[in-house]
């Protein structure tokens, strides 16, 4: 494309063009679509985990890491029946982002319970329990209930 060759637009991935100053969250949801921002990215900003990560972590239909301008976008695959359910996912300004409660459930689901959370107090436990049936997993339910009791 003419504007990409001239440097007016960036071409981070085939078929995707952005202005030089772009919203990284919006780009994350565009790079691999459909997807939504979740996991460590959301949990760190909510104060549930204290580990810093510069990666923008997303849920999608496949595992992939894409780097654009030094920013890593990490996509984790999850069952399509789960990511297709929009419960606990906020949609605004071309950005789909999980609530901290949904990100917590995504993390426990994908890590098979092998994850650590620094502070579960920011989570709305009623909302966690409301979203939990989306995953249709008795094992996940047991793990989540054990974590919420701690």
Task: Map each language-model feature to its residues.
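Hydrophobic/aromatic-lined pockets within catalytic cores
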Residues: 8, 47, 109, 113
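Exposed, interaction-prone assembly regions rather than primary DNA-binding/catalytic cores
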Residues: 49-101
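Short beta-edge/loop segments at beta->alpha junctions of small alpha/beta modules
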Residues: 1-37
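Hydrophobic alpha-helical interaction segments
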Residues: 86-150
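Short coil/loop linkers at secondary-structure junctions
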Residues: 48-49, 138
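A broadly conserved detector of short glycine/acidic/proline-rich loop/turn motifs that flank catalytic sites
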Residues: 23, 79, 108
